Amino acid sequence: MTILFLFLLLFLLMFIGVPIAVSLGLSGALTILLFSPDSVRSLAIKLFETSEHYTLLAIPFFLLSGAFMTTGGVARRLIDFANACVGHIRGGLAIAAVLACMLFAALSGSSPATVEAVGSIAIAGMVRSGYPQAFGAGIVCNAGTLGILIPPSIVMVVYAAATETSVGKLFIAGVVPGLLLGLILMVVIYIVARVKKLPAMPRVSLREWLASARKALWGLLLMVIILGGIYSGAFTPTEAAAVAAVYSAFVALFVYRDMRLSECPKVLLESGKLTIMLMFIIANAMLFAHVLTTEQIPQSIASWVTELGLSPWMFLLVVNIVLLIAGNFMEPSAIILILAPIFFPIAMELGIDPIHLGIIMVVNMEIGLITPPVGLNLFVTSAVTGMPLGATIRAALPWLMILLVFLIIVTYIPAVSLALPNWLGMS
């Protein structure tokens, strides 16, 4: 009865247009008040405790790092470097946009931030060179999803907090899938470009390439600092996020000098707004997940699945279907916090590696970011290009097929996710 009330109230609130964070918190709070012996005071304590997780402290720092990198002109230098690397290939500007998304993803940890930073520059450049705007918009919208797959990733941090999994292992596990997806997108773009006879830029000289690499070097070093520092044990993922924020501010203010000190309060305010919004969603989602755990729903479902005799591949198929449906209607962090505690014990029972499950969930969240009606990347791409939302959706959907094929690869070839952590002795 309790769990039926919880989900019916959640779907009712979402159906009438209540924001997802409020829907999660209100349904969880009312369920506790009506069906739990806990007092109103304990509800406030629980809401605070759910957002007090040490791992989640990485989120505001990664958001701040991305804000400094975007405002400080790092994205423009990364795009110039990507163009210098692959711009001479047929369809090179589009391939360079994917490469730039991969590079910026390794700095920001956020998919919408990647789309905004790269798309605002790369799409306009493609249009000026004769590419169809819809073609460029579709590519950047999809390639921007790499922001949550290539480490550092805010969604991975949330999964780690929900399942008590190592953030460092998740970050390392995301490297190969992120590179593989980027490579697949580049190959498909090249094939399409050959068919459509899209233009290529003149090949740059070695001197020009070295100049672009030198300008982008300070941004590229951040990837080495984050992953190298975590793997070497120099600092934890949360400490790495803090180091990234300080480093990004230093580069933007004193190395590239694209920012003035007077602009810092604005950057801090914008990243603070994003942090508050995301943490509000996370706190309410964790309250909702607390109700699920209190009612022992994950344990009940795990027992039921075990009795059904589902094989691991069948279970993962069900996981993907549920996540793909949820991704159409909910924000990634909320989905992770609600469903990860349910899927996690079942996966452990079936012998599925928790890191592998985490990468599968992240790839599903990537797809959710580009599927209507609430795919955030679609709205960001529409705002960046000035295209109507419907046109943006039509531009992005053909490339969605690539992500679905990639999801199958990641789901049923665990080595894609686990080979690098195992090779580094992190298994």
Enumerate the language-model features and the residues they cover.
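Alpha-helical transmembrane segments of multi-pass membrane transport proteins
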Residues: M1-S427
